[in-house]
Curated annotation (Swiss-Prot):
Gene3D superfamilies, per the entry: Zinc/RING finger domain, C3HC4 (zinc finger)
Catalyzed chemical reaction(s): S-ubiquitinyl-[E2 ubiquitin-conjugating enzyme]-L-cysteine + [acceptor protein]-L-lysine = [E2 ubiquitin-conjugating enzyme]-L-cysteine + N(6)-ubiquitinyl-[acceptor protein]-L-lysine
GO CC aspect terms: membrane
Name of the featured protein: RING-H2 finger protein ATL67
UniProt topology in membrane: Single-pass membrane protein
Pfam families: zf-RING_2
EC number: 2.3.2.27
Gene name of this polypeptide: ATL67
GO annotation terms (biological process): protein ubiquitination
UniProt pathway annotation: Protein modification; protein ubiquitination
Domain remark text: The RING-type zinc finger domain mediates binding to an E2 ubiquitin-conjugating enzyme.
PROSITE patterns the record matches: ZF_RING_2 (PS50089)
Organism taxonomic ancestry: Eukaryota, Viridiplantae, Streptophyta, Embryophyta, Tracheophyta
One of the record's GO molecular function terms: transferase activity
Amino acid sequence: MSTLASSASVFLVHPPLPPSPPQAGNHSYLTTLGFGYSIAIALGFLVLLSTVLLSSYICCRDSRRRTTAVESTGDRGGSVILPRIIFVAEEDNEDLEAGDVVVGLDQAVINSYPKFHFSKDTSAASSDGFGGGGDTTCSICLCEYKEAEMLRMMPECKHYFHLCCLDAWLKLNGSCPVCRNSPLPTPTSTPLSTPLSEVVPLSQYAADRRRARR
């Protein structure tokens, strides 16, 4: 009997062990890793979006600056840059012949010419077909006369001009700018006028007057 009992105990089969429960540490690690990836992706998207917006702003600003520069350059190119020189004459007359010398008037003689304030009524009343009566534009600077503006008149032909325009003209040329009549008591004919190549019109003076009227 003891032999059978001992042999029977040899064939006893033990039941399998239950599986061990999952560890909580691995689950928390995976959760933290997924959250980190989400934050990294969100930050990368924000950086990319900020870069695109900043690049677009810089491109738009540069394009606007180029457009403004082109427009300003076009305005300057379309406008006429007028010289600031009133009259230019050759000062070295040693190489000129005696007949080609520009004849001008002294300031004392110029000051003796009559001067008056311009008035539209006076201009209309003097418009009788003689001399400069009725003229409303200076033939030197091509600007219209303003009310009460000081003018100077040539004594013989009665043509009148802006005082400063005529004074500058007569310092280089003793004849009237319109009719070339000369008040100089010389036995010769009307003095030679200044060559056009040596005279620059009062364009800047005219431009300044136009700006002042605006």
